[in-house]
Amino acid sequence: MAKAPFNIQDQYLNQSRKERVKVIITMMSGDKLEGFIKSFDNFSVLMDYNSDVLIYKHAISTITAADGSFRLHQ
């Protein structure tokens, strides 16, 4: 059976979600949303930003940790 391909995007989002890391999502428009990743799938990210916000991945420019200390486990 073939091994699933390495997906750094899913790994980053999942670790951020599990560890409740506060992230800043910068949108393609330049708007910034700060909150916690609640869930995600192939096309969207559900973020706790005052209330639940569903963000389509194609509208996201970058995702960074709010305090800059987050490191992806290898």
Where in this protein do the model-derived segments appear?
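Short glycine-rich, low-complexity segments
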Residues: M1-E34, K38, N42, L46-Q74
